[in-house]
């Protein structure tokens, strides 16, 4: 019976179990035990991580709308005290600034309108 040729020059290798040396077998058993212990520990760690994830991913309890509304309503008094209210001086300044900007915009509009009427583009009343 002919041996099959392996592609790319691969050779048949002897397995470790083919050796009769007891020291090699003992080392092999020790390494196998260490690897199995490590895999068991990793499996246990992954289980604890999975349980931690499950605890973190617990669904939130839905609060009814009336409860949310009452919490909002009764919590407003705390929020009102936290709000920084504008001072009267700043309020007057902001109001005058808005009036000034509005007056400038109205002046520009009526100025352009009067210019068009003077040029005859629009007919006056």
Swiss-Prot record:
GO terms for molecular function: protein transmembrane transporter activity. It is found in: Membrane. Keywords: Membrane, Transmembrane, Transmembrane helix. It is a single-pass membrane protein. InterPro entries: SecE_bac (IPR005807). GO terms for cellular component: membrane. One of its GO terms (biological process) is protein secretion. Residues 36-57 are annotated as: Disordered. The keyword RNA-binding does not apply. Its main location: membrane. It comes from the Bacteria. The chain crosses the membrane at residues 92-112. This is Uncharacterized protein MG055 homolog.
């Amino acid at each position: 019976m002919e041996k099959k040729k392996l592609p790319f020059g691969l050779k048949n290798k002897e397995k470790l179990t083919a050796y009769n040396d007891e020291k090699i077998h003992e080392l092999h058993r020790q390494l196998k035990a260490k690897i199995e212990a490590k895999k068991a520990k990793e499996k246990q760690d992954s289980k604890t991580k999975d349980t931690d994830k499950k605890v973190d991913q617990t669904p939130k309890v839905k609060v009814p709308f009336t409860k949310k509304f009452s919490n909002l309503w009764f919590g407003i008094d705390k929020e009102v005290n936290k709000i920084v209210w504008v001072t009267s001086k700043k309020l007057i300044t902001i109001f005058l600034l808005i009036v000034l900007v509005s007056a400038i915009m109205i002046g520009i509009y009526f100025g352009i309108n009067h210019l068009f009427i003077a040029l005859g583009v629009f007919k006056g009343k």
